[in-house]
Amino acid sequence: MYADDKQIYVDTTLDKDDVNNACQRLHDCTADVSAWCASRRLQLNETKTELAWFGKPSRLEKLAAMNHTVTVGSSVIEPKDVVRDLGVMLDSGLSMKQHVAKTASTCFYQLRRLRQVRHLVGQELTTQLVHAFVLSRIDYGNSTLAGLPKSTIAPLQRVQNAAARLIMNLRIRDHVTPALRQLHWLPVHHRVNFKLCTMMHAIHTGQCPAYLSDTVQAVADNPTRAGLRSADTAAYRKPKCNTAIGQRAFSFAGPLAWNALPSALHDIADRRQFRKRLKTHYLSLN
């Protein structure tokens, strides 16, 4: 549930009483938030409040049949299939397809606008404009795309390819891979791993808040018998998870991307140097 940038999460089973209890807790929490805002001369924007259930399709169908709503102030909030969280569109199944489609559509619109003035500006300025209006949108919140199939993020890769063609003045039939290498651009799936590894590096060097570092555990902190060989390394433990959507969580995807890096990268303490070497590493994989 979202009210501007405030978020409330409640777990529930499919039991009717549990669902009723979850809705009541949401109502009580929003009432407390509204009262807190009012006491400080702030007003909770009820019209922007959104409600969504997240889970497997079969469970979501059963929840939808219960027809539950949540009351926030004088507004009745009904569940939506897609909600927006700080610019990231989250669908009930967390497939991220709507977010990818919306981002790709916005980026292509910006590219069409830039193409109209491409003949008036040079390559350097065009590159800066593409970074500002296109690549920044591809990279925003891209850690939520971790673990997705390449087919899902393919629209974003097509955006990047089109941006490279615009900068290099290539035709639609020209091969784009040499242009991407010349621009030193990582493919979209590597850009996602780059973000994950940057966050893991901040955890490893103690430069991140506790709410992020508490989600992962270093192997050396609590080595198991099977992990004694790697207890003296910078590896992080992956939690046991048997579902594809669970493996997309940062607690799993972060250590997975970090542990796959060469050990030489783990030893770099400086953030800027780490990012430079990390990009070089991913470019070498293309």
List each language-model region with its residue ranges.
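Hydrophobic/basic alpha-helical segments
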Residues: 1-286
